[in-house]
Amino acid sequence: MPQHDQLHRYLFENFAVRGELVTVSETLQQILDNHTYPQPVKTVLAELLVATSLLTATLKFAGDITVQLQGDGPLSLAVINGNNQQQMRGVARVQGDIPDNADLKTLVGNGYLVITITPEEGERYQGVVGLEGDTLAACLEDYFLRSEQLPTRLFIRTGDVDGKPAAGGMLLQVMPAQNAQAEDFDHLAMLTETIKSEELLTLPANDVLWRLYHEEEVTLYDPQNVEFKCTCSRERCAGALKTLPDEEVDSILAEEGEIDMHCDYCGNHYLFNAMDIAEIRNNASPADPQVH
């Protein structure tokens, strides 16, 4: 059995091509546990999680990456946010009924794939592409073609392992500033395309690579753990409250007695009473956390 929730990087010794392989189970489960989603939405979030992990691993700096789908369909928003430490969180917004067999275009409708890269140092970058492909992987390949101009292929699989949702994926990309032959890259992509969900989700990474590339020389590097981690906090909520007009905050306090701020990603609630608000306005730290 593979060690799920790990990202593996690998290189081909005889080709200027790099690869990544990731499988997720517990991370995906934690994202899904916070909400009740129809199965097609769960599948989209699983694919987005895999894609975000793979894309984050291509970054050469510390920072965040957000991959989101948005459109006018019943799935108005699906987003995964991750960072270079492979810490992930995600959420979806559903409006209207979703058939069990809904595909990506049925779910999102007329929409876009938006990728936002935010380095800890440097300028923020955002790329937007229309949903012209039939799958998320195809849309992401279109993004790379338009923005990175590096030949890139993604292979994403979803399923269940021991009754729990799981997902996996592989990425192939020509090394920057290298002259990989197109036929070599296409050959490796054809091999990778043959990976089955069961193989990717149940076999160790080295076994997967052997099945796909046993005639090639491949170097597999130490894995990086993938985990669910939400960045919400009481302090961030306090900062958000401070940006609201005083009269709006006071009106909520008068009606409700306290302000309940809810994190869509992890489900935490942060409660603020009148004393907390007074301390926020005085630039003091709010009273002891009230989280449930």
Curated annotation (Swiss-Prot):
BP term (GO), one: protein refolding
What is the protein name stated in its UniProt record?
33 kDa chaperonin
Known role:
Redox regulated molecular chaperone. Protects both thermally unfolding and oxidatively damaged proteins from irreversible aggregation. Plays an important role in the bacterial defense system toward oxidative stress.
**The encoding gene:** hslO
User: Lineage of the native species?
Assistant: Bacteria, Pseudomonadati, Pseudomonadota, Gammaproteobacteria, Enterobacterales
Q: Does the keyword Chaperone apply?
A: yes
User: Species name for this entry?
Assistant: Salmonella choleraesuis (strain SC-B67)
Q: Which family does it belong to?
A: Belongs to the HSP33 family.
Would you name any one GO CC term?
Answer: cytoplasm
> GO molecular function of the protein, one example?
protein folding chaperone
